[in-house]
Amino acid sequence: MAYEFNHYYELQNVATGKYVNVLGNHEDGTVKNGETVNLFSRTNNPDQRWALENFGGNGNVRIVLQRGEGWYALNYNTRNTNCIVWHLNTADDTDTVITTVEV
């Protein structure tokens, strides 16, 4: 499937059928730096909606959450193996950039 930049998608794990999800209750729209990302059953809410944002071409993208004030991107966690979300400080914030690889 081809994807469009800045269009929201739900990202599903093929093996489990579960979706990439920000853990917790965010009904008030508030997201905080460092919140854990996990796999969860489909909820049909913005905690599972992600946009692919082009970052300089060459397959470089950010995966950005729909929920929350500002831009929260999928990010790595230096303390364990779980992914987290983190607010983008600037447009040049490169620690949230990943490279897509066609398989």
Which ranges hold each PLM region?
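Lectin-like carbohydrate-binding module/patch detector with strong preference for beta-trefoil
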Residues: 1-103
